[in-house]
């Protein structure tokens, strides 16, 4: 049996000293939890293109991807593996997040990351960010 690989991209948008986070809306798995906005890669799509598409669809937000900061394999099983790509991006001039799927968003400083109820799958990356920014 062939193992299913599901790839997901998450945006790391750092603007004016704060990181963009979005809350999962009601009706979706893990509703109310916070995450870095993004979504699944479509067949043949790069992480950068998926990031641009997902942020446009979910937040009406135009960004320019830079580079992959972190990659994480989550919950590997014999049947399925989830790969998270955390991609740094910066907003296009004049673009601001406007949620399209009834979710909330917020901007947090690296020192505020522990105050946000993140999805468990994002926690390793949150710890990496805290270390990178010297947050204890």
Feature map (PLM): residue ranges:
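Conserved N-terminal beta-strand and adjoining loop/helix that marks the start
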Residues: 1-19, 40
């Amino acid at each position: 049996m062939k193992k299913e690989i599901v790839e997901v991209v998450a945006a790391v948008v750092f603007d004016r000293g704060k990181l963009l986070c979005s809350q999962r809306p009601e009706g979706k798995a893990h509703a109310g939890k916070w995450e870095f906005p993004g979504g699944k890669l479509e067949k043949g799509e790069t992480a950068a293109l998926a990031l641009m598409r997902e942020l446009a669809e979910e937040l009406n937000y135009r960004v320019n991807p830079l580079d992959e900061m972190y990659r994480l394999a989550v919950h590997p099983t014999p049947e399925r593996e989830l790969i998270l790509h955390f991609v740094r991006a910066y907003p296009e001039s004049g673009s601001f997040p406007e949620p399209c799927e009834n979710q909330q968003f917020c901007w947090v400083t690296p020192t505020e990351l522990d105050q946000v109820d993140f999805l468990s799958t994002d926690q390793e990356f949150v710890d990496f960010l805290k270390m990178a920014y010297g947050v204890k």
